[in-house]
Amino acid sequence: MKKYFLFILTTLSLTACYTTKNLPEDEVLYRGIKKLDYDAQLKRDSIQGQGVITALADAYNTVEGLLTGDANALKTEEADKGLIKDSLKKADKQDALNYETAKEEIKAALAYSPNGAIMGSSYYTHPFPVRLWIYNKYVNSTTNFGRWMMNHFAATPVFVSSVNPKVRSTVAHNTLRNYGYFRNKVTYDTIPMSNPRKAKISYHVKPGPVFHLDTIKYLPFYPQADSIIKATMNQSLLKQGKPFNVQDLDAERKRLQKEFRNNGYFYYRPEYISFRADTVMIPQKVQIQVRPLPETPAQAKHPYYIGNTRINIYKYNKFQLTDSITFRGQTYAYSNTEDRPPLRLRAILPNLFLKKGDLYQQTNQDVTQQKLADMDIFSSMRVSFVQRDSTLNNDTLDVVISGMLDKPYDAEFIGKITNKSNNYVGPGISFGMRKRNAFRGAETLGLNVWGSYEWQTGAHVEGRNSLINSYEYGATASLSYPKLMMFGLEKKRWRRLISSTNFQLDAKWVNRANYFGRVSFGASINYTLQKGKNIKHEFSPFSLSYDLLLNSTERFDSIITANPALYISMRDQFVPSMEYTFTWTKEKEKHLQTLKVNLKEAGNVTSGIYAICGQGFKKPEKELFGVPFAQFVKLSAQYTHRFTLTPRSCIGTRLFAGVVYSYGNASTAPYNDLFSIGGANSIRAFSIRSIGPGSYHPERSSYSYIDQTGDFKLEANLEYRFPIIANLYGAAFVDAGNVWLIKENSNQPGGQLKMSEFGKTIALGTGVGLRYDLDFLVLRFDLGIGIHAPYDTGKTGYYNMTSFGKSLGYHFAIGYPF
């Protein structure tokens, strides 16, 4: 053992020398940041924090005491003290968030990866910098092989001089000033290592006290601008008591510019607004003056109105306009190659909100640009304005809209490999094609075909013919419009909202070796309406699917005979349904909240027609075209909340609840509309569909997971996400929940929801995970650890897992679970 240890030490010593063997004499190899120290005082001094608030409260209490007596004065004093305490607490939170944000920018300014960095870290390196060794070996080589090694495998050494810690310290110093730390000090030390040709850098940051905004005064601009400022003062981003922040100043300039432009001041720019700050008058306070730039151009002080509109539409890769037409004072010019416009004028006009004679408004320009972009048929689009002439007496802006149509066709090909838990593996492919502006009305015609086949692996293959004959394939055709196609029922005010309509047809054929063959057909109409940034409506007034069981084996017949719920979900049936989804999103400071509510009904309209014709609404076994149809109501809601602790760490929560109730024509909803639980995006200590309903736990088999669905679902998740190194993040989580049956089923004992057994039937798991953020993609690994199984495991007590090893769940996934 001692010999191996000495060998490792000798190897590391030699390699350490080899990383600096051929470095320039006056250079020192940079080996990363040794430490980054902060010396901060976040809490406000009591005098600084209470200041004006306390003085006002004391004055108020004195007057109140003179008017109503000492008793009331004491009550008022206690109330005001509570108000002061809450105000200080809120102010401390603002200071803490401001400081953490500044720290993240300082880290970014000081960060610099050395050679051999682990995942881009500025602190940690691996012991074998092979590319640096190659540099030292071949940097002076004159052979072809040496030059080839240098060009393809060597890494240029990172020197302390190229890191330039002095400049980085200055950048960090200026960053702190931008966040209100005007008395900050940032220094650095170069720390030599055992090899004097190598060094690390330590940075020392002393922010000092943060300065807060005191008085904010808006100096006169010009009469109408002053009226706009006064009317929108409550929307100002500069608030007394907030930490000084340059970003708030920039945001306030942009806010005022938008307000001015929404009132006709087309030529107004943010740089026409300046600030003057006084940090001397009151200690640790900043007095701000918002003032107009003296050199503001005369054009920026006058409102403008919309004139004529010209629309230029170029075909893909055609740069000449050959024809034009005039309609209602608007000129439409286009590239003509087929004796007709490439885009119908009526497809463009509903997306224009710049009406002749109207006062120019930034909002109308933004909506027009957004609606044109959402048409998804242009490779480039520009909305520009041209003043009739340059004199101040002319207040008219002509609109020029120029767009080049995108290439008409898009295609994609996807290949995949499936590996299922029942030992089935196999490849799959899909091919999709889209045609933009298919009928010259901005519509998109899409077609997608896909297929896959599987075979069973392992020692016990089910049947001799199951090698390749488990397969499925299907096709989807869709026609989408970037607007609501409601056949005259749409409201005019909806035109300004982002919307779309999608008509879809689909078909799928599934063959499961030794079980069944099944075909499904579907048709649907879907509407989407986006109301602002926070609210989204999705409505499907018509959706009809038809499932047909083509053939089945005796083995599968025995399974569905023993399970009536499975039989109902697999029988030939129509599912006529309507569906509505409401999504609400709110993002404010450190909070991101999302609420999604979905309501789906099936068969009720059809049953209503039967009732009008004299048959009972809840009468069972009604048929549509000679085939039974499903009848149910399904409601689900999901709420997520992400609370940001620091710019790189947060706490995420999710709460999901859902219920599906079947009645009338069916005792059970179709299988696809039932709830299941477990897996990479649910309770991660248990695999998908391995728990529930309730305490029911079937014997394991290839298709036992089919049984484990329910009518009611409740799930809660809590996850803490934190940084580890560079783009590698960690997570710790807790998951809980289950699915239950509303009605008792003798084939699934313990599956019914009972309040007396509710706590025992909640599955609980915890665990840890890793997330690697590639900016465009997040790779995720989670290790779930079971705490409590909702079924009988043979062990007593709340922790009832049979063994620690069997309680683990491993999940590789893409993206966050919620």
Residues of each region from the PLM?
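Strand-connecting loop/turn motifs
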Residues: 181, 265, 408, 440-442, ...
